[in-house]
Amino acid sequence: MTFQFNFTIEDHLEDELTSLGDGALALHSSKESLVSERQKGTHRDKKCSTEQSDLLQDHLWEHKSERNEAPSQDPDSSFGAANSSSNLEPHEEKPCLKVAKEHAVPKDLKKVLENKVTETLPGLQHVNISIMKTTLLKENFPGENIISKSFSSHSDLISGVYEGGLKIWECTFDLLAYLTKAKVKFAGKKVLDLGCGSGLLGIMALKGGAKEIHFQDYNSVVIDEVTLPNVVANSTLEDEENDVNEPDVKRLRRSTVAQELCKCRFFSGEWSEFCKLVLSSEKLFEKYDLILTSETIYNPDYYVPLHQTFLRLLDKNGQVLLASKVHYFGVGGGTHLFQKFVEERNVFETRTLEIIDEGLKRCLIEMTFKYPT
């Protein structure tokens, strides 16, 4: 399989300062020129600051309440601050986090699959994403506009805008194969498909008898146009295969499909915002027994919120199954860097389950708490 990444990398500003004195003067002048822009964006900046402050407070609370055995230092915050400051220009504001939201399952399930063409994998169906993209472009889809941006930039990833959910990446197939081969048990478990994209990992958990499955992706259009249709297509697959004509049987099957979909919830948004959303529920949040995630460690900038998500949402006896390439060229992430990051925080232990040495080298990793009690 030929696999290629296309990335959008912003040009850095050239350093036009010719001396220390001139540099200080230029910096001062630049600051003054930004005053009016900052005044115009006061409300936005305050909102960003509040969100960032809330995230830090949430982290400190989790650190104190759940990491009693781990070192008292807060490594995630220091890593995030250093990483953030090194990537921002002198006057560049840190962008606001993408607010998370829950997507309701439509009552009319036929509309979910309207204008969708499905393809078949062993035991699974999924929407043909290329046809879906073309259809939405022709219809001038009013959503996040990530499809046209992806086409125009010739990129499968646009950091902070589009995080690759409109593609089934190689490692997803690796993890699907492992789940089957290792006979991973889903029955009675609460499962999260994190960075779900097509949602095939969560769908496999649904078919395996999981009691509850949550699907999360960065982009809302991915949830609405890919994940939800895939879940519906796989829930109704049995009906289509048997071509049942008896009204009573059809009603029974529709009832079964509805019951299956009641086990599923769908979310979009940035990871730390997703954590806030599910943890702010009125009823006590039951943590996940199993988190499935594929191709989510390509960018080291995202390691802090990803680690925090595992820390906050995984049950103390839970398990993360993660699929990734060993190295992502052009972005810098990969399994070795992420495992080093995890080891330095001393919260989780990692174990390599499988190495796939075909094309770009890939790995399957298991994560569990070092201190489950």
From Swiss-Prot:
GO molecular function: protein-L-histidine N-tele-methyltransferase activity
Enzyme class, UniProt record, top EC level: transferase
E.C. code: 2.1.1.85
Post-translation changes: Monomethylated at His-154 through automethylation. Automethylation at His-154 positively regulates the methyltransferase activity toward RPL3. Probably methylated on other residues.
Gene Ontology cellular component list: cytosol; nucleolus; nucleus
Oligomer and partners: Interacts with GRWD1 and members of the heat shock protein 90 and 70 families; these proteins may possibly be methylation substrates for the enzyme.
Name assigned to this protein: Histidine protein methyltransferase 1 homolog
Gene: METTL18
